[in-house]
Amino acid sequence: MEFGFFKGLPHTGSNENFSDYKKFNNSISKENVISHIRSLEAGLTSEPSIELFTGEKIRAGIYDDGDFVFPYEFLHYYANYDIGIPYEYENYLKSIGVGQEKKGTEN
């Protein structure tokens, strides 16, 4: 599943509305999601992307996480703006333990 390809990004098929991502109300904390995404290996391009709201140049590329593909730039927007992640991706993250507190363990 692809997500986060907002209109204005330099990727083929970038046709999603940024504002749609404001509707996601996720139960996993942003800190946990950001930490997980930062742990992924990114495929970066040499061409920059232009930040949709400030016009500054930012890195461009792609993240591939299981069955999910999203632009490298998504992390910038997720970390800096009030948006969420699709519920399908959130469910996947939960299934691999992201944001799931470990209950007391036996020694």
Annotate each PLM feature.
Residues 1-107:
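Alpha-helical interaction/linker modules in multidomain eukaryotic proteins
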